Amino acid sequence: LDLGRLYNEQRFAKGVTMAEVSQSCQRMLDDLLAGRDATLLDNPHYRLNIVVVKSHGLLADDHRGRLGLGLSSVIADNLRGRARLSRHFERLIIHDPRQAPPLHPLKDFPSRSLDLELGNLRQALLASGSIPMVMQGVRDLPGAGAGTYRDGGLLDYHLDLPYHGDDIVLYPHFTDRVIPGWFDKGLPWRRSNPQGLQDVLLLAPSREYLARLPYGKLPDRSDFKRFVGDDARRNQYWQTAMSESQRL
């Protein structure tokens, strides 16, 4: 609830820069954690896992022109085959050292893991939301080495991962479709691996539930543009949706 409130309170003027959005998100993270960082690492019930990608080539640059060229190359390669994204990204799973995530060895893309600790927690959280052209990448993530780290959803948009074990994986989601990567959103033929999801229980909003929300959808990042200059109306819409989700 605190995160929802803080995110709802964000204000972005037309023409906001990547640096300004990153600074705003850093302040939001500071307000959210408020010196309680350690509680995320010693929670007795939950183990935090954060997925980011290390960006290669032009994707390591936050200059709009060079970054735009890099993204164009990613889009073209992704159309030829998802495996070609290994030229552009390396997957990094930053996890609670008390328990590694329950995954089979990751062989689809270059991947590695890193222990989550106080020294890299905030940078990892910030990197996990660093969408290219929206926010700056996070430089030189502590423990991960030099480089530019961005939102792990670029590779693993909906966590189409090879889970192992006999337990059921509960996946609260915002849609009833599992889309492998960010660049697959407009590719209806790019589907998740059914074998990897055979023990996944997907919990998603029904069409009837969405129809009852203002504008017939969940709030999303595009609302900042939709309601630019009218944050009061966006706040009201988002608060209504959050209240409905809390009731649900």
Could you tell me what each predicted segment is?
Residues 2-248:
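Patatin-like phospholipase
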